[in-house]
């Protein structure tokens, strides 16, 4: 965790709430302007990472274009939240470590600071982020395996890889809260001078805090706070249920360390802010997403009639397939 202090994550990918909101608004506005100018927002990508932007439309009086409505910034936020939850689902399905899940989520979040969901569909970017996270964390899973495991075309995963890496500015090392949680729990053993029964309780706290960190990672918190503070917030939330340690006293012990950058009240306020984001987080349901998905398809130039014909073709193929096959199938980690 010491390396976080000199990392690109700290220097480039931690924002104030105001700056983060500005980045999202700017990405949305670029796509809105593209839709007005070109009648579509789809940015094509090839395997080398080269981008092809839509051309200006000829004639501005097209009635069909006037019906196109861009996604609002709030609708984009819902879309990102929906697919961030899907990142966790995919990682859980493959039993990937928490670190891969966290890295994939950070890649996804950072990508959409540069782009609108109206320009690159998050379903495709999500899978590429999972694949890229596996590579950087040295968990050797091929794009074919990921695609096959969730019934998606692996060529799309590979097609977007270079575009994703470029959008991340090749800042691929991600610091997540999980290792810091382990470090704090080890430090708590010393702080409590823990006996066997207390060590067992601390193990429960570690497990609970890890689950809470998964929730924290779905909020904007990873773009607003360093991983040490995310870890402490996760521990405090879990401890509120388990009651393993006097957490206020433990925070006082942390800020009394020579390298502490915060007072107890400052640190408590930071943890309160993280907990607020977790409490107010809402994952959109499939039902919530229906209207937004329809708008997104229009922006990307995917007509509903085309989608319906594809669905009919798929149903027809599925029906003929079924008829021919009768059987279905030490010291506390830094916090600043």
Swiss-Prot record:
A Gene Ontology cellular-component term: cytoplasm
Broad class of the protein's primary localization: cytoplasm
SMART domains named among the record's database cross-references: CYCLIN
Alphabetical list of InterPro entries matching this protein: Cyclin-like_dom (IPR013763), Cyclin-like_sf (IPR036915), Cyclin/Ssn8 (IPR043198), Cyclin_C_2 (IPR031658), Cyclin_N (IPR006671)
Entries under Pfam families matching the protein: Cyclin_C_2, Cyclin_N
A biological process from GO: reactive oxygen species metabolic process
Biased composition (Basic residues): 312-322
Presence of keyword Transmembrane helix: no
Localization: Cytoplasm; Nucleus
Stated family: Belongs to the cyclin family.
Quaternary structure, from the entry: Interacts with CDKA-1, CDKD-2 and CDKD-3, but not CDKD-1 and CDKF-1.
Protein name: Cyclin-H1-1
Gene: CYCH1-1
């Amino acid at each position: 965790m010491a390396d976080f202090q000199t990392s690109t994550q700290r220097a480039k990918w931690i924002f104030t709430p105001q700056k983060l909101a500005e980045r999202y608004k700017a990405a949305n506005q670029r796509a809105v302007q593209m839709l007005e100018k070109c009648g579509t927002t789809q940015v094509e990508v090839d395997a080398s990472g080269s981008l092809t932007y839509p051309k200006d439309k000829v004639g501005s009086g097209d009635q069909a274009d006037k019906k196109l409505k861009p996604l609002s910034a709030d609708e984009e936020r819902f879309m990102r939240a929906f697919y961030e939850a899907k990142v966790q689902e995919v990682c859980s399905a493959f039993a990937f470590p928490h670190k891969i899940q966290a890295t994939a989520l950070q890649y996804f979040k950072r990508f959409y600071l540069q782009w609108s969901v109206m320009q690159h569909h998050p379903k495709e970017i999500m899978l590429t982020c999972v694949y890229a996270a596996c590579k950087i964390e040295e968990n050797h899973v091929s794009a074919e395996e990921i695609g096959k495991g969730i019934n998606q075309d692996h060529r799309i995963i590979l097609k977007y890889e270079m575009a994703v890496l470029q959008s991340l500015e090749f800042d691929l090392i991600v610091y997540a809260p999980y290792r810091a949680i382990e470090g704090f729990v080890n430090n708590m053993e010393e702080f409590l001078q823990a006996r066997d029964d207390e060590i067992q309780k601390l193990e429960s706290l570690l497990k609970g805090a890890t689950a809470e960190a998964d929730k924290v990672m779905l909020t904007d918190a990873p773009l607003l706070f360093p991983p040490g503070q995310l870890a402490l917030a996760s521990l405090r939330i879990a401890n509120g249920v388990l009651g393993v340690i006097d957490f206020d006293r433990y925070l006082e012990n942390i800020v009394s360390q020579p390298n502490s950058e915060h007072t107890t009240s400052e640190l408590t306020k930071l943890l309160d802010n993280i907990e607020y984001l977790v409490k107010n987080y809402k994952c959109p349901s499939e039902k919530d997403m229906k209207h937004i998905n329809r708008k997104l398809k229009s922006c990307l130039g995917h007509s509903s009639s085309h989608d319906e014909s594809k669905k009919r073709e798929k149903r027809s193929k599925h029906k003929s397939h079924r008829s021919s096959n009768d059987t279905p199938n030490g010291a506390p980690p830094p916090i600043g």
